[in-house]
């Protein structure tokens, strides 16, 4: 398909101010819901990073002596979302409890940690109860990993993700309780433990964007829009490639590749050319958090390979007008 510079310029723009307001409202309503359970706001709504939409709130429950961190994660947090009808992901993190990992021969006893006496799903039950009380049963739907809150003209459709902290002590050789790689652990209703690193993702996207003279996020928005177009045309590889995944592909491209050309289309072609040249090295790529592998299976590796080839065949650039 032939794309003009003006089209790409449109795709590369961040969402409107009204979308930002709805995103902010989504986190605020979760804050208000948890107040009914006795939580108090310790630090009001603020941005975790001024260059993102990663709104955050800190709450505490004096009677239970623990804190919550509530923050926007995913593509809204990194400001790379491209379709207005997509939902916003909000993590509700219980800071006082964490899942852990240690190097061989070490256990929590070496760090003088104690086990929680509550099952992981108890916290999700508590959050769900607060949301139902605030919105009513018909507006709240519990899923395997998240609790969905229906959207309206005031707020975005929201996936509220109750979770715990994660601490990886694998590289600590001093039994130092503060020496860990931190993330979050989502405990699903099916008993799965999902570990990810949303805060590193947010911060790394800001660094990458700054290092590429703000071209990185523009290019990510363009590839995400093209992915949606391929999905609309029934492309199976695009369907199996997540929004986070295509962002990860572009995050692994060296910064200097973003500065070769002034035109959006020329820059995009240069990035796709790099992926084609390195298509057999995708197993070495990292997620934008720079911790987990982007392709953790041969199946995913094959999907990403085919997606890259499909984008190359789909994207044609007419060339015109330099962007500001």
UniProtKB/Swiss-Prot annotation:
Gene name of the encoded protein: cdnE
Names of required cofactors: Mg(2+)
Record keywords, A-Z: Antiviral defense, ATP-binding, GTP-binding, Host-virus interaction, Magnesium, Metal-binding, Nucleotide-binding, Nucleotidyltransferase, RNA-binding, Transferase
List of residues binding Mg(2+): 87, 89, 159
Organism: Staphylococcus schleiferi
EC numbers, comma separated: 2.7.7.-
Protein name, entry field: Cyclic GMP-AMP synthase CdnE03
Family: Belongs to the CD-NTase family. E03 subfamily.
Organism domain of life: Bacteria
Amino-acid positions noted as binding ATP in the UniProt annotation, renumbered to this chain: 89, 144-145, 159
GO MF terms, alphabetically ordered: ATP binding; GTP binding; metal ion binding; nucleotidyltransferase activity; RNA binding
Cofactor details (free text): Binds 1 Mg(2+) ion per subunit.
